[in-house]
């Protein structure tokens, strides 16, 4: 998608509607992450409007964030408890907070928002840079095959159908570059709006290699926040990484064993 600016995907209009339809996994994610934090400070890459950070903070975890979009930060600040979360504006692949954490996490497919393999590797390296010796980096994404219909790299999906508006996801996937170009088109009685976004889809195996290049190792992988075992039928994954030369992360099942 020519002249695409990643920051434009989360402008004022998108930020204003971002929480209109929550995924429903917020509390499960917060409980999972709280166990891993084990009383230590946490850092969320791409904290957004605080969809996960605020429930996690409600569990007593001190949460910091890094966020590219000033509009998403503004929405977070306007929420109850949002002013208690320290946020640094910047690119999560390179921006630092000056602290180390027991938990760094990146959810809702957001690793895909980095559009080159090098940037995705830099994101893993930045997570490693922020971890303490027993810290854990958590990544949650869909599996690419769950997004791309078999043999259909171009598709249109009806995301919302209402009496006065419809929202369509118009997409094209390039398996060579692994880039998925999407435009979320809202057609309503008040007009038409478009919200473009480009993602670079990667598999769990690719993430594991990126982690190794960044000095991390895979500790555990689940199919969801409920710790369902990851298998061939899974459509998403929650993966836990630790420093290659670090101790087993606190709060992980292997540590508990």
Regions from the language model: what does each represent?
Residues 138-210:
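SAM-dependent methyltransferase
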Residues 1-48:
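Conserved class I S-adenosyl-L-methionine
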Residues 102-118:
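A short SAM/SAH-binding and catalytic strip from SAM-dependent methyltransferases
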Residues 50-94:
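Class I SAM-dependent methyltransferase SAM/SAH-binding core
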């Amino acid at each position: 998608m020519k002249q695409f600016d990643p920051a434009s995907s989360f402008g004022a209009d998108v930020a204003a509607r971002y929480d209109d339809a929550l995924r429903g996994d917020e509390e499960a994610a917060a409980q999972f992450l709280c166990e891993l934090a084990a009383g230590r400070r946490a850092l969320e890459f791409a904290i957004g409007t605080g969809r996960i950070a605020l429930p996690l903070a409600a569990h007593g975890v001190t949460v910091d964030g890094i966020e590219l979009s000033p509009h998403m930060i503004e929405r977070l600040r306007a929420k109850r408890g949002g002013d208690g979360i320290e946020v640094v504006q910047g690119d999560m692949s390179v921006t630092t907070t000056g602290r180390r954490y027991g938990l760094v996490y990146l959810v809702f497919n957001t690793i895909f928002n980095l559009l080159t393999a090098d940037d995705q590797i830099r994101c893993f390296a930045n997570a490693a840079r922020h971890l303490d010796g027993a810290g854990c980096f958590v990544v949650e994404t869909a599996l690419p095959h769950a997004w791309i219909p078999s043999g259909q790299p171009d598709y249109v999906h009806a995301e919302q159908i209402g009496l006065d508006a419809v929202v369509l996801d118009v997409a094209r996937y390039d398996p060579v570059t692994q880039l998925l170009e999407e435009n979320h088109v809202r057609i309503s009685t008040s007009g038409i709006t478009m919200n473009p976004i480009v993602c670079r889809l990667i598999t769990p195996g690719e993430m594991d290699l990126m982690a190794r290049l960044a000095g991390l190792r895979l500790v555990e992988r689940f199919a969801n926040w409920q710790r369902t075992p990851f298998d061939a039928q899974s459509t998403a994954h929650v993966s836990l990484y630790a420093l290659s030369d670090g101790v087993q992360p606190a709060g992980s099942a292997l540590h508990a064993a």
